[in-house]
């Protein structure tokens, strides 16, 4: 009898190996925690709220969106890599270039760029330079003229340190020949009241901000190859003579070691959700992407190369 049971167990295990995903056919069976590493109100949060009902419909379980801001995402990412179980029930929002720049520049970042199992990169938002509507700076040239005449006096807020906003500010300084003072915030959400309250001169933020706050803010330039359809009257930096193109790719990741069938199931759910919410996202100034699997990894490497110069400059100044 014992021999029969052992043989049966071996046979079942063999079938599970031969038929990938058989052990995960029931995933998911309980609620999923979707952590956003920034404050509510920013692009990551807005997107997660649009995704949430579509994901729940697709997966058949609750998807609980939580927030853990701090360190431009580093607080949540480091905790996730330390503690999240690779079972698909803990997933987290990820941003490029944040996850590339922070571990390279900060010795204490607490996480590794390659320490995530990327499920999908689902959209991109180009950076924009914005000022308040009552600002004396009507154009990018106005802003640059002030910054040149008053080195370090112009304060530029943004989401996090060594984030897309921060790195774009550094690239802008170099391209325009100015010295600015960058003021990091825990996400896009807190940047807006700081700008409208007059606590900072301007903000290097994202296209969604230019669209959502067009009645309260003035967008001076957008860091895209072409004008953003949702901001048709805003010139690109390139149009104005500054070769600056960049922004944030956003996506979602699971812990390393998460079984591929689970990752594939989540990727399908996010892909389907992306298609459903795309119109709303496009209207807010987002550019939709659908990078999964090898394409997701290639995107990380492509952007690592794109930001190599500015990251190298930062490393030199820190030595």
Outline where the language-model segments fall:
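Bacterial N-terminal signal peptides that target proteins for export
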Residues: 1-12
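Hydrophobic core
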Residues: 13-18
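Sec/Tat signal peptide C-region and signal peptidase I cleavage site
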Residues: 19-25
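N-terminal (or domain-start) structured segment
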Residues: 25-114, 152-154, 161, 174-204, ...
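Short coil/turn segments
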Residues: 39-41, 96-97, 132-137, 158-163, ...
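Hinge/capping helix and adjacent helix->loop/strand transition within the periplasmic-binding protein
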Residues: 55, 79-90, 103-186, 190, ...
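C-terminal lobe and pocket-closing loops
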Residues: 208-274, 302-305, 317-319
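Mature extracytoplasmic/periplasmic domains
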Residues: 279-300
